[in-house]
Amino acid sequence: MLKTDALLYFGSKTKLAQAAGIRLASLYSWKGDLVPEGRAMRLQEASGGELQYDPKVYDEYRKTKRAGRLNNENHS
């Protein structure tokens, strides 16, 4: 689930944070383009299914991230 999609759906960062069950300040610590996986299912429920949590998206993100680390010039 993309953060931009969640923000567009809920309309404000405050409402997104409330739906995710977090403080607004915690929302600013979300890194990357994806909603943290632990919050994605909650947002799916809060949106009545309009937003979708897809575990495959998160699995692919992790695979890509790991592959990038292995290609780092400091690794052999």
UniProtKB/Swiss-Prot annotation:
**One Pfam family named in its UniProt record:** P22_Cro
**Coiled-coil ranges per the record?**
none
Presence of the UniProt keyword Transcription regulation in the record? yes
What is an example of a GO molecular function annotated in this UniProt entry? DNA binding
- Residues annotated as DNA-binding are 13-33
In the record, biological process GO terms are: cell division; regulation of DNA-templated transcription
Checking Gene3D superfamilies in the record gives: lambda repressor-like DNA-binding domains
User: What keywords are annotated for this sequence in UniProt?
Assistant: Cell cycle, Cell division, DNA-binding, Repressor, Transcription, Transcription regulation
Q: Which InterPro entries does this UniProt record tie to the protein?
A: Lambda_DNA-bd_dom_sf (IPR010982)
Function of this protein? This protein is a repressor of division inhibition gene dicB.
Name under which the protein is recorded:
Repressor protein of division inhibition gene dicB
